Amino acid sequence: MLNVLFFAQPRELIGEDSIQLEGDFATAEAVREHLAQKGDRWALALEKGKLLVAINQTLMPLESAVKNGDEIAFFPPVTGG
């Protein structure tokens, strides 16, 4: 099982801050694609190219491998000012 967290705009669009996800996913991108198929709000919240991912609290590329028990966090790019 994966623990999937959502922050900022993805959290607001989806209406959830976290979910438990069962299944066999090879990469964070596979998780993103699976969740984006849950509906229009999910697809908008998890739009490729507008999202960063952290696996076990480390910023990683979407193509990074995931395994059972991992924590995956999706969030928009952070800007400063």
Enumerate the language-model features and the residues they cover.
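Ubiquitin-like/PB1-type beta-grasp interaction modules and other compact soluble beta-rich domains
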Residues: 1-79
